[in-house]
Curated annotation (Swiss-Prot):
One of its GO terms (cellular component) is cytosolic large ribosomal subunit. Disulfide bonds: none annotated. This protein is located at the 30S-50S ribosomal subunit interface and may play a role in the structure and function of the aminoacyl-tRNA binding site. It comes from Chromohalobacter salexigens (strain ATCC BAA-138 / DSM 3043 / CIP 106854 / NCIMB 13768 / 1H11). GO terms for molecular function: structural constituent of ribosome. This is Large ribosomal subunit protein bL19.
């Protein structure tokens, strides 16, 4: 059993009520993020490859990388954040590493990831 206080553990479990799809590094995902502009709120999509995932209960996070106008953009999202509206898995990537930081140095065809074929 973990050394966390039972009250803290109960609160964290309650806040982790959001249904998050199963995804892994190498997968291409679309994250819908709530953005507040002035007095209105809208959803902004961020689509890219998951290059890292951190599983720490309520403090879980994942990093998504995409190329926008020839510039690499990475964004780290807290999995259970209220600002993250939804996560949709577009395609499954077949990779052997947990952290795909090597993609930062690659561009073009060498940065492609094989698709995982369903069995």
């Amino acid at each position: 059993m973990s050394s966390k206080n039972k009250v803290i553990q109960a609160l964290e479990t309650e806040q982790m009520g959001k249904d998050v799809p199963e995804f892994a590094p190498g997968d291409t995902v679309t994250v819908q993020v709530k953005v507040v502009e002035g007095n209105r709120e809208r959803l902004q999509a961020f689509e890219g490859v998951v290059i890292g995932k951190r599983n720490r209960g309520l403090n879980s996070a994942f990093t998504v990388r995409k190329i926008s106008h020839g510039v690499g953009v990475e964004r780290t999202f807290q999995t259970y954040s209220p600002l993250v509206d939804s996560i949709e898995v577009k395609r499954r990537g077949d990779v052997r590493q947990a952290k795909l930081y090597y993609l930062r140095e690659r561009s073009g065809k060498s940065a492609r990831i094989k698709e995982k074929l369903a069995r």
